[in-house]
Swiss-Prot record:
This is Pulmonary surfactant-associated protein B. Residues 63-145, 194-271, 290-365 form the Saposin B-type domain. Pulmonary surfactant consists of 90% lipid and 10% protein. There are 4 surfactant-associated proteins: 2 collagenous, carbohydrate-binding glycoproteins (SP-A and SP-D) and 2 small hydrophobic proteins (SP-B and SP-C). The lineage of its organism: Eukaryota, Metazoa, Chordata, Craniata, Vertebrata. The gene is Sftpb. Residues 25-190, 270-376 form a propeptide. Keywords: Disulfide bond, Gaseous exchange, Glycoprotein, Repeat, Secreted, Signal, Surface film. Pfam families: SapA, SapB_1, SapB_2. Residues 25-63 form the Saposin A-type domain. One of its GO terms (cellular component) is multivesicular body. It is found in: Secreted, Extracellular space, Surface film.
């Protein structure tokens, strides 16, 4: 029961954001008519004119439709993360994590860390969302002159806006001029023990990553597609379900605990040292092995679709780069199934169907069939 309750808590901001989009139809701007409605996917939803725009305006668009729709979906996901309901849900979960710390003296300090630094971490997360790059990565937009994806250790180059935001007041008395890699000493008026801020920061970020129900969110995002005509709705739903999980993986992969805590608290990039928190068995459970392999399989096939036969093995291994936390497992999956994958990709028109044939994915729950396109 607790597991289901947590999933609905995390799903709530998504549903609220979709509901908010339709409830804002009274906006005076909507009175401008179709010229305003169809400027963007978000405006069409707000003015309850998505069906009109798809049938009368966007239905006559050129070959860049999929690219633009993908970017619009990314923008909607970005907006969801900015909703107060989403941020409140994350905050409440982290406050519960603070409350179960084994050393109760750390609880007020843990909450203080949340108050000061959670907004900065959320801003950093949102700053990693680049619609054009993400949609090119999943194959819905043409590849431009983009720079190669940085490796985790290369991400220390901090953009100027983020550097400006890092000038935040430190916790009173918590830091010295030269903080250590795992703890910051306290002043004499503070607790008479070293406070492991860096370990605490890394632990909380890892917990948030672990409890985000990616599959549930993907289905929730796809629900907006039910307001459009059946054929176009099927395309929209498959776009949302197929790529939302890939998008979340790409975004969460950039919120590496060591990197974020290094930026915010000037922590060392070394692994944190500290006692493990009690397991979250009452709240979450890991994805079943088949779900994990299904996710690996679909990502690998999506990555290899537009490559030559000679380049396929390299493309498949590159697909594992986005799974920073499970990269080794992904590499093992690719090595184990390489012959079957090489045989499936040239004939593949849908990643889920191909992975179902491989035996690592279950039958899709949705009755709508995904569209087929040479660009995917």
């Amino acid at each position: 029961m607790a597991k289901l309750h947590l999933q609905w808590l995390l799903l709530l901001p998504t549903l609220c954001s979709l509901g908010a989009a339709t409830e804002s139809a009274s906006s005076p701007d909507c009175a401008q008519g179709p010229k305003f409605w169809c400027q963007s996917l978000e405006q069409a939803i707000q003015c309850r004119a998505l069906g009109h725009c798809l049938q009368e305006v966007w239905g006559h668009a050129g070959a860049n439709d999929l690219c633009q729709e993908c970017e619009d979906i990314v923008h909607l996901l970005t907006k969801m993360t900015k909703e107060d309901a989403f941020q409140d849900t994350i905050r409440k979960f982290l406050e519960q994590e603070c409350d179960i710390l084994p050393l109760k003296l750390l609880v007020p300090r843990c909450r203080q860390v949340l108050d000061v630094y959670l907004p900065l971490v959320i801003d950093y997360f949102q700053g990693q969302i680049k619609p054009k790059a993400i949609c090119s990565h999943v194959g819905l937009c043409p590849l431009g002159q983009t720079k190669p994806e940085q490796k985790p250790e290369m991400l220390d180059a901090i953009p100027n806006p983020l550097l400006n935001k890092l000038v935040l007041p430190a916790l009173p008395g918590a830091f010295l001029a030269r903080p250590g890699p795992h703890t910051q000493d306290l002043s004499e008026q503070q607790l008479p023990i070293p406070l492991p801020f860096c370990w605490l920061c890394r632990t909380l970020i890892k917990r948030v990553q672990a409890v985000i129900p990616k599959g549930v969110l993907a289905v929730a995002v796809s629900q907006v597609c039910h307001v459009v005509p059946l054929v176009v709705g099927g395309i929209c739903q498959c776009l949302a379900e197929r790529y939302t999980v890939l998008l979340l993986d790409a975004l969460l992969g950039r919120v590496v605990p060591q990197l974020v805590c290094g930026l915010v608290l000037r922590c060392s990039t070394a692994d944190a040292i500290g006692p493990a928190l009690p397991a979250l068995e009452p709240l979450i459970e890991k994805w079943p092995l088949q779900d994990t392999e299904c996710h690996f399989c679909k990502s690998v096939i999506n990555q290899a679709w537009n490559t030559s036969e000679q380049a396929m093995p390299q493309a498949m291994h590159q697909a594992c780069l986005r799974f920073w936390l499970d990269r080794q497992k992904c590499e093992q999956f690719v090595e184990q199934h390489m012959p079957q994958l090489l045989a499936l990709v040239p004939r593949s028109q849908d990643a889920h169907t191909s992975c179902q044939a491989l035996g690592v994915c279950e039958a899709p729950a949705s009755p709508l069939q995904c569209f087929q396109t040479p660009h995917l």
